[in-house]
């Protein structure tokens, strides 16, 4: 499991306004952590587009448009992750790093 891979993840059970169900997520934790820990930090993807939200990053996955929900960042057990769907482009990864830094600091 590598940083910026997109994988299926089972997010249930969820609580309150947390994103739920099985959906794609982007791994955002560092590869050194991904290799050593039993958990990964991810941002879920959603097809519910909100172009004006500064907490979301628009990406194209296959033929569909989606948004990476940086406001829904969370740590999951690796056992919740399924097959790899793809990876972010270098430009998308750079934009995601910038947005995470804007939201959560350096």
PLM segments and residue spans:
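Conserved functional hotspots at enzyme active or ligand-binding sites that engage polyanionic ligands
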Residues: 1-106
């Amino acid at each position: 499991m590598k940083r910026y891979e997109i994988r299926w993840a089972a997010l249930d059970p969820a609580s309150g306004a947390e994103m739920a169900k099985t959906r794609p997520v982007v791994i955002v934790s560092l590869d050194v952590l991904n290799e050593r820990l039993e958990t990964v930090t991810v941002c879920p993807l959603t097809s519910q587009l909100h172009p004006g939200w500064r907490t979301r990053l628009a990406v194209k996955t296959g033929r569909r448009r989606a948004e990476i929900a940086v406001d829904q960042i969370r740590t999951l057990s690796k056992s919740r992750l399924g097959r790899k769907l793809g990876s972010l482009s270098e430009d998308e990864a750079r934009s995601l790093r910038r947005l995470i830094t804007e939201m959560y600091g350096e």
